[in-house]
Amino acid sequence: MARSVSSFKLLGASIFDGLYVSISRRGYSGAPPAAVTASFGRPGAMGKVERRDAMKESSSSETRAYSSAWAPDPVTGYYRPENCGAEIDAAELREMLLNHRVRSQ
């Protein structure tokens, strides 16, 4: 009886370890799982709504690409994005943010 209990413990532990390794192991797959493609019906099929959304996203990304044009920096002359804010020196920023009031007691 004691021998069967100890062998059951070893068998259970080995099964648990194998299950844990298979769950925790990470892998890479080039193709999506069958459940993902099955949820969309035929693989590669797109409905009108999905096509319309995809077209909106692509057109908005094109306008974003054109809105971030590069322009010469008036101070340095080097090119930088137009929508970039002015740089500030760390010492000047520290001086603005810290209050240097002297407390009288």
From Swiss-Prot:
<protein>
    <recommendedName>
        <fullName>Late embryogenesis abundant protein Lea5-D</fullName>
    </recommendedName>
</protein>
<dbReference type="Pfam" id="PF03242">
    <property type="entry name" value="LEA_3a"/>
</dbReference>
<keyword id="KW-0346">Stress response</keyword>
<feature type="compositionally biased region" description="Low complexity">
    <location>
        <begin position="57"/>
        <end position="67"/>
    </location>
</feature>
<dbReference type="GO" id="GO:0006950">
    <property type="term" value="P:response to stress"/>
</dbReference>
<feature type="region of interest" description="Disordered">
    <location>
        <begin position="48"/>
        <end position="67"/>
    </location>
</feature>
<comment type="similarity">
    <text>Belongs to the LEA type 3 family.</text>
</comment>
<dbReference type="InterPro" id="IPR004926">
    <property type="entry name" value="LEA_3a"/>
</dbReference>
